[in-house]
Amino acid sequence: MTSAIAVDPKAAKPVGVTAGHAPAGAGKVGVLLVNLGTPDGTEFKPMWRYLREFLSDPRVIELNKAIWYPILYGLVLTTRPKKSGANYARIWNQERNESPLRTYTRAQSEKLAEALGDLPDVTVDWAMRYGNPSTASVAERLVAQGCDRILSFPLYPQYSATTTATANDQLFRALMKLRRAPAIRSVPPYYAEPVYIEALASSIERHLATLDFEPEVVITSYHGIPKPYSDKGDPYQAHCLETTRLLREKLGWDEKKLITTFQSRFGAQEWLQPYTDKTVEKLGKDGVKSIAIVNPGFSVDCIETLDEIGREAAETFHHAGGKNFAHIPCLNDSAEGMTVIEAMVRRELSGWV
């Protein structure tokens, strides 16, 4: 017969405690919002650092390094930083000295933390795949705060190896350096989730109601990827087309009213079509006088939406004969946008909290 041994809970040392580390049984959950990335400034050096990291990612550029690196270092990184820096300067948040993407992603994190106030063991943070704050630094911070589980949320509604997959790659790469790695979950693509489609439709209707004209055509413009990536099995194009189909259905519009295009192509390789710039130009030349463009694939406004669409696409349309142009903002940290993020996070935290 064994006798019970009384243990003073106040005197008991938590299992796994090491100086400078949280107890093994801390049981906290980290929610990590991950966006693409941003340079730290618009000058040549920060732009060079950012573009080097971004364009060195084999998920983004699927060329042999022996072929790509001479092009990257010999041509791209000697010319593109200056041009890209000028583009960023036009949209730069001067008050906070940062890009809008960083401003909005931080705001999303802060608002999500507030919305999850009923879950005291959940910590919300945010990071970038490229640039700062880095995925590695924030993951390490969450672990140091006692998070033994991390829910990663790559902020891309439509999956692509060039975005969602590389965000997950980077997180696991960071965890490889940790002795004590947390359990990991990743929020799946949400391109067809009703809460996302409803948020998009609501945002579009709300912004169209503020215009003094009615667009004849509304374009859903998604960031493109090289066509060979899609041909090899990347589901991104199918996800984009399904988002537009569901959005069209929700808004009650036909295929001529709401169309799909792809933007931001880079290099001479064929990318997903139809191209946004070519479509906008053709609409203007064909006599269409009023259009609006929305970017469902971007969780927050950034260089590709504010400058490439808000400025370049508008100029292209006007030069081609168009009259009225509107760029509908991304969901950002709006009420609609935060509803989507909170809904996805709460669902994926099931069983953990």
Swiss-Prot record:
PROSITE patterns tied to this protein: FERROCHELATASE (PS00534)
E.C. number: 4.98.1.1
Keywords: Cytoplasm, Heme biosynthesis, Iron, Lyase, Metal-binding, Porphyrin biosynthesis
Substrates-to-products reaction catalysed: heme b + 2 H(+) = protoporphyrin IX + Fe(2+)
UniProt cross-references to Pfam families, sorted A to Z: Ferrochelatase
GO biological process, one term: heme biosynthetic process
Binding site for Fe cation: H223, E304
Iron in keyword set: yes
Recorded metabolic or biological pathway in which this protein acts: Porphyrin-containing compound metabolism; protoheme biosynthesis; protoheme from protoporphyrin-IX: step 1/1
MF (Gene Ontology): ferrochelatase activity; metal ion binding
Subcellular location: Cytoplasm
InterPro entries attached to this UniProt entry: Ferrochelatase (IPR001015), Ferrochelatase_AS (IPR019772), Ferrochelatase_C (IPR033644), Ferrochelatase_N (IPR033659)
CDD domains: Ferrochelatase_C, Ferrochelatase_N
Top EC class for this record: lyase
Family statement: Belongs to the ferrochelatase family.
Stated name of the protein: Ferrochelatase
Originating organism: Mesorhizobium japonicum (strain LMG 29417 / CECT 9101 / MAFF 303099) (Mesorhizobium loti (strain MAFF 303099))
Primary gene name: hemH
